[in-house]
């Protein structure tokens, strides 16, 4: 038996004399200059983030059955950046402000793992249990007004997962999870953008969701050089419910679109192990959702785009043990996502927030002598330019041009008896580029360069 207890506290606030200056999307970066921040602004960052869990593990609590039970909780308060009142795009009743997130969670999970042995060629693992999560969250402004009221949810979810191996080489996975979620929404007033907008007073109530989701997978591994697999799974989430409620246009919950997002996910691929020195992996996946979860900008605010969506892509990887002390590898991921337009055609691309640019990563690991290592890593992210400027000649937020990035990182280390020393140099060539977030968001004030060369020395002492 084993009992494990963990507590973690994190706090990070930004107190700086610098304020943003300049910045023109696709032309010049925003930089920090000495200045005074707005007197209404407070330090942004995480005021507190408490995390704790208690875990109990028991091997063979019953015959051929292990138990893992845990209780966990967290409490978070994060303040975002200050937004100056902008008459062209008013928000929060035409005032300046700073939004925040307050979140509290408490959960319980009990999981059993049973082993069934029918013969040398047929056996099964069964994982089954129960999840419970209590979550209370809100999005206030630091001045006391509520952009999103306190939402309280309870999620009960029993689950079952079976993995069976037949004839030693055929693996079958089958599972299911039933979610029962109730969300309590209080009576609240929608925080208007303009004072002239009609006041919407929403009558609260209880939102209830019940969903059964399944997954199934097959794999065959008799031949090391070709091990195919295929899988199907269903996804379920009440994605961005708070974002929907804070932009409500109706006064009762029944008139507000609060339906959950359900996805059907398909994957097919193969794994190959060639003489234990070269491993190859490739897969193609496809996901469809009748009710989408992409985000779009509406009068300066993010809202959920409920248009049907599909996402597809490929993932490829290769790892080679060239020498006993030399290893190299690469992996490639490419995604694309489209929305179904009013004409019934899949002719609209999903935003850069949901779909990243293609990514290629390569590495070389070398151990020149015992207890030392060197790693050189190259990362390339591709270009994603799927959208045209709007009528005013500007790119909508989330639809900006994401340009190519090429980075080289170096890590070296040595393991000694009393400590481990490591040296990491990120962006080794001091490559100048804009952050992907600033490129996709297309905001002048946030169009900023990423970090240049950064050197980190770490020492871990053993006792």
Language model regions located:
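Residues on the lipid-exposed face of transmembrane beta-strands in outer-membrane beta-barrel proteins
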Residues: 1, 52-58, 108-114, 158-164, ...
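Face-selective signature of the C-terminal outer-membrane beta-barrel domain
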Residues: 2-10, 45-195, 219-224, 231, ...
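Transmembrane beta-strands of outer-membrane beta-barrel pores
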Residues: 9-13, 73-77, 132-138, 178-184, ...
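Outer-membrane beta-barrel translocator domains and adjoining extracellular loop/strand segments
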Residues: 16-24, 79-88, 137-145, 184-193, ...
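Extracellular loop and loop/strand-boundary signature of outer-membrane beta-barrel proteins
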Residues: 35-43, 55, 91-100, 139-150, ...
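Membrane-embedded beta-barrel scaffold of Gram-negative outer-membrane proteins
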Residues: 66-84, 219-239, 243, 257-312, ...
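Gram-negative outer-membrane beta-barrel transporters
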Residues: 168, 281-289, 305-391, 429, ...
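C-terminal beta-signal and adjacent terminal beta-strands/loops
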Residues: 328, 370-371, 380-389, 413-463
């Amino acid at each position: 038996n084993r009992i494990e207890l963990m507590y973690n506290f994190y706090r990070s606030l930004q107190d700086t004399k610098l304020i943003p200056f300049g910045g023109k999307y696709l032309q010049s970066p925003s930089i920090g200059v000495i200045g005074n921040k707005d007197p209404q602004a407070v330090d942004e960052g995480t005021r507190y983030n408490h995390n704790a869990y208690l875990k109990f593990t028991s091997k063979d609590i019953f015959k051929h059955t292990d138990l893992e039970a845990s209780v966990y909780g967290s409490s978070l308060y994060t303040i975002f950046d200050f937004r100056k009142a902008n008459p062209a795009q008013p928000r929060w009743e035409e005032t300046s402000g700073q939004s925040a997130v307050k979140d509290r969670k408490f959960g319980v999970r009990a999981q059993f793992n049973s082993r069934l042995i029918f013969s040398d060629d047929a056996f099964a693992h069964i994982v089954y249990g129960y999840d419970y999560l209590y979550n209370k969250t809100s999005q206030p402004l630091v001045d006391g007004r509520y952009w999103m009221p306190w939402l309280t949810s309870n999620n009960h979810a029993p689950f079952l997962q079976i993995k069976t191996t037949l004839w030693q080489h055929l693996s079958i996975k089958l599972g299911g999870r039933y979610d029962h979620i109730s969300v309590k929404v209080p009576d609240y007033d929608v925080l208007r953008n303009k004072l002239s907008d009609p006041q919407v007073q929403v009558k609260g109530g209880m939102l209830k969701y019940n969903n059964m989701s399944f997954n199934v997978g097959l794999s065959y591994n008799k031949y090391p050089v070709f091990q195919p697999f295929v899988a199907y799974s269903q996804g379920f989430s009440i994605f961005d419910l708070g974002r929907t409620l804070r932009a409500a246009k109706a006064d009762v919950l029944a008139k507000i679109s609060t339906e959950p997002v359900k996805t059907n996910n398909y994957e097919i691929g193969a794994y190959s192990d060639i003489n234990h020195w070269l491993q190859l992996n490739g897969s193609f996946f496809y996901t469809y959702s009748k009710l989408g979860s992409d985000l779009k900008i509406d009068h300066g605010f993010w809202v959920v785009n409920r248009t049907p969506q599909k996402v597809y892509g490929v993932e490829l990887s290769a790892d080679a043990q060239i020498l006993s002390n030399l290893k190299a590898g690469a992996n490639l991921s490419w995604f694309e996502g489209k929305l179904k337009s009013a004409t019934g055609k899949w002719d609209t691309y999903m935003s850069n927030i949901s779909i990243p640019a293609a990514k290629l990563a390569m590495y070389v690991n070398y151990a020149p002598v015992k207890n030392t290592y060197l790693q050189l890593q190259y990362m390339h992210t591709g270009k994603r330019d799927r959208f045209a400027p709007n009528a005013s000649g500007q790119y909508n937020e989330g639809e900006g041009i994401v340009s190519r990035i090429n980075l080289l990182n170096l890590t070296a280390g040595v393991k000694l008896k009393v400590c481990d020393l490591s040296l990491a140099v990120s962006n080794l060539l001091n490559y100048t580029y804009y952050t992907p977030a600033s490129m996709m968001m297309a905001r002048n004030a946030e169009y900023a360069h990423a970090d240049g060369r950064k050197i980190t020395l770490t020492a871990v002492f053993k006792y």
